[in-house]
């Protein structure tokens, strides 16, 4: 059995930054550190940080006065930000800068009195945070997930209308929704490039190349990870058996026993150690050496806040 690795895969710059913010806060200030929502959607990462003293909460009211609070990579609404500001809390923001960019687009539309449409998945924390940047009662903020949603949407003034997208969507599906928006609302204005982030786009491109060669595709990522789910869906749409797994223990021998080639990739919030463990398990099941495919090189780095830049040797 051949093992192929998608490239790129795993951590993106925004996830790397968010995890570093929590780790550095724990190093500098000690436990407990409170984090609103899972800092990234990966069970292994969250469990590891919890063992170090991170406490994951959903409501600001759960945080005691004087504590340190970190916003997750998915971002928060202005209401949550204002609630935290009203408390005696030290706040660090781990929102991905590419999510913040979308927040700024929504806030700008709100100030101008334009109505805004967000393409995204209802209930996802990034969507809740982005929708929560709009606060102009004269306008309106709407959420759509599909071309069908667009057909049913009623706005107040289609002459002053803009759209934004969640950063972790399917590139193909989003393109269909944008086409539907432009057909329904010819004057709608969007970003120069859709808001789907570089890492999401690159990983979908990589899993497409992987699925062209593999009989079975394993996507390392947690069930609540939007971008990981999109990778598995894309491989399935290409007619391949694809499975979303948290770690190597999820692999069922029946999935791969008749496969000549198994492809492995990982969502943007999945650490490489999980991929290495999957490779080891596949080799136990008869796989050969893992061969990485060629792909786009990623060199993007997002700096942590200067207050949290720490040389661990200085605090040992």
UniProtKB/Swiss-Prot annotation:
Cofactor note: Binds 1 [4Fe-4S] cluster per subunit.
Residue sites binding dimethylallyl diphosphate per the record: 41, 74, 124, 225-227, 269
GO-annotated molecular function: 4 iron, 4 sulfur cluster binding; 4-hydroxy-3-methylbut-2-enyl diphosphate reductase activity; metal ion binding
Ligand binding ((2E)-4-hydroxy-3-methylbut-2-enyl diphosphate): 41, 74, 124, 167, 225-227, 269
Active site residues according to the UniProt entry: 126
Pathway stated in the Swiss-Prot or TrEMBL entry: Isoprenoid biosynthesis; dimethylallyl diphosphate biosynthesis; dimethylallyl diphosphate from (2E)-4-hydroxy-3-methylbutenyl diphosphate: step 1/1; Isoprenoid biosynthesis; isopentenyl diphosphate biosynthesis via DXP pathway; isopentenyl diphosphate from 1-deoxy-D-xylulose 5-phosphate: step 6/6
EC number annotated for this UniProt entry: 1.17.7.4
Catalysed reaction equations from the record: isopentenyl diphosphate + 2 oxidized [2Fe-2S]-[ferredoxin] + H2O = (2E)-4-hydroxy-3-methylbut-2-enyl diphosphate + 2 reduced [2Fe-2S]-[ferredoxin] + 2 H(+); dimethylallyl diphosphate + 2 oxidized [2Fe-2S]-[ferredoxin] + H2O = (2E)-4-hydroxy-3-methylbut-2-enyl diphosphate + 2 reduced [2Fe-2S]-[ferredoxin] + 2 H(+)
Residues holding isopentenyl diphosphate: 41, 74, 124, 225-227, 269
Key words of the record: 4Fe-4S, Iron, Iron-sulfur, Isoprene biosynthesis, Metal-binding, Oxidoreductase
Domain of life: Bacteria
Cofactor(s) required, per the database record: [4Fe-4S] cluster
Top class in the EC scheme: oxidoreductase
Gene Ontology annotations of biological process type: dimethylallyl diphosphate biosynthetic process; isopentenyl diphosphate biosynthetic process, methylerythritol 4-phosphate pathway; terpenoid biosynthetic process
Binding sites annotated in the UniProt record for [4Fe-4S] cluster: 12, 96, 197
Function noted in UniProt: Catalyzes the conversion of 1-hydroxy-2-methyl-2-(E)-butenyl 4-diphosphate (HMBPP) into a mixture of isopentenyl diphosphate (IPP) and dimethylallyl diphosphate (DMAPP). Acts in the terminal step of the DOXP/MEP pathway for isoprenoid precursor biosynthesis.
Family from the record: Belongs to the IspH family.
Subunit architecture: Homodimer.
Designated name of the protein: 4-hydroxy-3-methylbut-2-enyl diphosphate reductase
């Amino acid at each position: 059995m051949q093992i192929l690795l998608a490239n790129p895969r795993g951590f993106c710059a925004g996830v790397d930054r968010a995890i570093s913010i929590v780790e550095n806060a724990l190093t500098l200030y000690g436990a407990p550190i409170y984090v609103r929502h899972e800092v990234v959607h990966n069970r292994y990462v969250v469990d590891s940080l919890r063992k170090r003293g991170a406490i994951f909460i959903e409501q600001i009211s759960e945080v005691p006065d004087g504590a340190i609070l970190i916003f997750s990579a998915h971002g928060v609404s202005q209401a949550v930000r204002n609630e935290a500001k009203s408390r005696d809390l030290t706040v660090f923001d781990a929102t991905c800068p590419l999510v913040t960019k979308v927040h700024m687009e929504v806030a700008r539309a709100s100030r101008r009195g334009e109505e805004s449409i967000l393409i995204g998945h209802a209930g996802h924390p990034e969507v809740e945070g982005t929708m929560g940047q709009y606060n102009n009662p004269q306008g309106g903020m709407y959420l759509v997930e599909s071309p069908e949603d667009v057909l049913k949407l009623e706005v107040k003034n289609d002459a002053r209308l803009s759209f934004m997208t969640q950063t972790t969507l399917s590139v193909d599906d989003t393109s269909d929704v944008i086409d539907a928006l432009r057909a329904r609302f010819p004057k709608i204005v969007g970003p120069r490039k859709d808001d789907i982030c570089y890492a999401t786009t690159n990983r979908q491109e990589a899993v497409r190349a992987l699925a062209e060669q593999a009989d079975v595709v394993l996507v390392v990522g947690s069930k609540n990870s939007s971008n990981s789910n999109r990778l598995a869906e894309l491989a399935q749409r290409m007619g391949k058996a694809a499975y979303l797994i948290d770690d190597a223990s999820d692999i069922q021998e029946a999935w791969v026993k008749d496969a000549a080639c198994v492809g492995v990739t990982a969502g943007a919030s999945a650490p490489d150690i999980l991929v290495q463990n999957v490779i080891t398990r596949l080799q136990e099941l008869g796989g050969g050496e893992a061969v990485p495919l060629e792909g786009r090189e990623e060199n993007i780095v997002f700096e942590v806040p200067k207050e949290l830049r720490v040389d661990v040797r200085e605090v040992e």
